């Protein structure tokens, strides 16, 4: 989804060799379903009341660093002009595919590699690295970003299959509800 693509772009821009391991046949399928296929990529209102969980204030530092204005500026920079309706920002094309396409192009431009139809079999810590075993080969990484969508949209790949790996590395999981 958008979070995984944005994280991969940020990782590559920070100088890391970055690979997306995607178990679906295409990266970013969930984006196509957002905003009824129009992809509202940000909102004018982003207060604490918009967030769920045990600690909604956890989001505050993130939005101080990359707020709504920076989000709009980022998307403009990569080719998405906004169309604003009722406080929601959509691409001017009103097509979610536009957002997916420019995110994938920006990821490729920054050096991100995509490996699709890649099922993760195991992730193990080996010293300073992680060994990621997949159906298409093994990968070593200093860091892993889990951007799985969990149960948001099983048809687009967000099916919860990464949850055991996330829990294995000590992350506390709160009650999960599907959401785009």
Q: Residue ranges of each PLM-predicted region?
A:
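Glycine-rich FAD pyrophosphate-binding loop
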Residues: 12-36
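Conserved dinucleotide-binding and phosphotransfer motif residues
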Residues: 14-16, 78, 110, 169
């Amino acid at each position: 989804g958008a979070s995984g693509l944005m994280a991969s772009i940020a990782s590559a821009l920070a100088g890391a060799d970055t690979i997306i391991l995607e178990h679906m046949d295409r990266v970013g399928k969930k984006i196509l379903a957002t905003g009824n296929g129009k992809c509202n990529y940000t909102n004018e209102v982003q207060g604490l009341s918009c967030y769920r969980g045990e600690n909604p204030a956890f989001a505050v530092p993130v939005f101080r660093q990359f707020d709504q204005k920076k989000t709009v500026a980022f998307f403009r920079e990569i080719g998405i002009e906004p169309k604003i309706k009722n406080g929601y920002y959509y691409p001017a094309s009103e097509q979610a595919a536009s957002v997916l396409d420019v995110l994938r192009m920006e990821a490729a431009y920054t050096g991100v590699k995509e490996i699709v139809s890649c099922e993760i079999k195991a992730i193990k810590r080996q010293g300073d690295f992680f060994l990621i075993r997949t159906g298409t080969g093994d990968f070593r990484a200093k860091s892993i970003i889990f951007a799985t969508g969990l149960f948001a949209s099983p048809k687009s790949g967000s099916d919860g299959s990464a949850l055991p790996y996330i829990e294995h590395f000590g992350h506390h999981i709160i009650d999960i509800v599907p959401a785009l």
